[in-house]
Amino acid sequence: MKLTCMMIVAVLFLTAWTFATADDSSNGLENLFLKAHHEMNPEASKLNERCLDAGEICDFFFPTCCGYCILLFCA
């Protein structure tokens, strides 16, 4: 029991030490959201794409149907 507790404490200590001494050249999470916001391209969002209705011609390799692409037609 004592050995188990000592092992748990040692693992927790080493984990904390690893995170505390890790080299972080990007200033941590400080600018993470600002950077992600500026790199985001809203025009490339999949939510802006219109899906094809049933009966319209679709591409087999890159289907954009609302349902399934079967034999080059949306189902």
From Swiss-Prot:
Cysteine disulfide links: 51-66, 58-69, 65-74
Superkingdom classification of source: Eukaryota
Annotated GO CC locations: extracellular region; host cell presynaptic membrane
Gene Ontology MF annotations: calcium channel regulator activity; ion channel inhibitor activity; toxin activity
Cellular localization per UniProt: Secreted
Signal sequence segment: 1-22
Tissue specificity statement from the Swiss-Prot or TrEMBL entry: Expressed by the venom duct.
UniProt-listed Pfam families: Conotoxin
Propeptide: 23-49
Keywords for this protein: Calcium channel impairing toxin, Disulfide bond, Ion channel impairing toxin, Knottin, Neurotoxin, Presynaptic neurotoxin, Secreted, Signal, Toxin, Voltage-gated calcium channel impairing toxin
Protein task: Omega-conotoxins act at presynaptic membranes, they bind and block voltage-gated calcium channels (Cav).
UniProt remark on domains: The presence of a 'disulfide through disulfide knot' structurally defines this protein as a knottin.
Assigned protein family: Belongs to the conotoxin O1 superfamily.
UniProt name for this protein: Omega-conotoxin-like TxMKLT1-0142
Organism field: Conus textile (Cloth-of-gold cone)
